[in-house]
Amino acid sequence: MKINMLVIGGSAGSLDVLMDVLPNLRKDIHFPIVIILHRKKDSESLLADLLSSRSPLPVNEIEDKQPILPGVIYLAPPDYHVLIEKNNTFSLDVSEKVNFSRPSIDVTFESAADAYPNAIAGVLLSGANADGTEGLKYIKEQNGLVIVQQPGTADVAYMPQQAINEIEVDAILNKEEIASYINKLV
């Protein structure tokens, strides 16, 4: 399967996983990577700098109407839903929270699957609610690739376990296996 977009979603406990995954990504990844993390509304934007310090790829916090470029990691800003448009740009949205979250992983997974049918991969990491499960179902319906962190390696197993319970996932990976799996998608 050719991947043109990878979206990673997570909540409680997922930042540590990303800090392990990012340094091990290939520098020649040809698709954009979008990261949706549940963050407090007033959280500082230092997270992009922190992730950038660990990544071989550039990391940018998403801005409204920003073009989506290959080989770049994009981070959702706090308190905005991130929509991926069919014209290869982002839209930021402040509509109601979904699964008590803004940004919502489901919102981004679903819009990414619409924009990149047959060429989307979704990765769901550690977290404390069911956000991401419906979006992964939709990715699967659009013939995308569905990857979930092994709940036993998650700080908070609820989110990945919900996905496993509801969806036929393509891969269940220990956190140490995620980067090499992504690298094989290149």
Question: Across the structure, where does each feature detected by a protein language model lie?
Answer:
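Conserved acid/base catalytic micro-environments in cytosolic active-site loops
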Residues: 1-186
